[in-house]
């Protein structure tokens, strides 16, 4: 499913004064594409995801899922945050079950999906665990499973690995790359991590500081699976880093 941002402008009111967070964002994601957005803190990256998820509204422009304007929270879009946001009184299984709360599924299909995504996210043996018994990485696996269990067409990821240690982060990045290859999900990833963006994305969108505008879009012409240590990937990392530094240096 394609996702289109058409001339999006967004303001917040701060101390009675309008603050422009996003300005004239024009971006399209093709079906099955993974696009990473990178930029300085406060440039509106997470706001863009909230708009696509129907959690927030825009003053100007429109967002389309396929040819359908986003009005309210779309059924075929899932949003995963940096914090797992698991309910502490629910087991891993029941936290994942929440992702299907509004779906009209048979009990057998609900259980089949839970088992499938437990396996996909490497959570076998943790089905009956409580959130306080999980490491940060395992909790984030549960959050991603909850986001996937409704079988969305579009997955929005808001720095999902930002709070994890380096090894766990790389493991979950590799798992996401595998999931992306196994499905036709359209994925929009917000990150501060240049290596993560280049390792995962088909294109990297570099944002300028607030008000957030698209400074540059860089295609990542690397085949999957990707080697983090390859010369080609390191060159792409350098190109994205340079574009990011240039965007930060521009007076807006």
Task: Give a label for each model feature.
Residues 97, 101, 108-126, 178:
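Conserved ABC ATPase "signature" region
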Residues 61-73:
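Conserved ABC transporter NBD signature motif
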Residues 144:
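Hydrophobic anchor residue at the start of the ABC signature
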Residues 129-132, 150:
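Conserved signature/switch motifs of ABC ATPase nucleotide-binding domains
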Residues 38-40:
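The feature captures the beta-strand-to-loop junction immediately N-terminal to the Walker
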Residues 90-98:
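Short coil-to-helix segment of the ABC ATPase nucleotide-binding domain corresponding to the Q-loop/switch region
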Residues 53:
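Helix-to-loop junction immediately C-terminal to a conserved catalytic motif
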């Amino acid at each position: 499913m394609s996702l289109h941002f058409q001339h999006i402008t967004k303001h917040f009111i701060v101390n009675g004064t309008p603050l422009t967070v996003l300005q004239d964002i024009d971006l399209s994601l093709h079906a099955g594409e993974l696009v990473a957005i990178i930029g300085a803190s406060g440039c509106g990256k997470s706001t863009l995801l909230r708009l696509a998820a129907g959690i927030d509204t825009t003053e100007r422009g429109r967002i389309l899922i396929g040819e359908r304007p986003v009005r309210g929270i779309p059924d075929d879009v899932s949003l995963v945050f940096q914090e797992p946001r698991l309910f502490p009184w629910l087991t891993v299984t029941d936290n994942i079950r929440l992702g299907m709360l509004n779906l009209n599924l048979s009990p057998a299909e609900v259980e089949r999906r839970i088992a499938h995504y437990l396996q996909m996210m490497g959570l076998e043996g943790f089905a009956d665990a409580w959130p306080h018994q999980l490491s940060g990485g395992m909790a984030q696996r549960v959050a991603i499973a909850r986001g996937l269990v409704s079988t969305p067409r579009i997955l929005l990821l808001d720095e999902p690995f930002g709070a994890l240690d380096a090894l766990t982060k790389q493991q979950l990045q590799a798992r996401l790359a595998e999931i992306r290859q196994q499905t036709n999900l359209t994925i929009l990833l917000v990150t501060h991590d240049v290596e993560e963006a280049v390792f995962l994305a088909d294109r990297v969108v570099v944002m300028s500081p607030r008000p957030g505008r698209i400074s540059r879009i860089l295609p990542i012409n690397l085949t999957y699976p990707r080697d983090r240590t390859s010369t080609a990937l390191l060159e792409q990392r350098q190109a994205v880093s340079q574009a990011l530094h240039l965007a930060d240096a521009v007076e807006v």
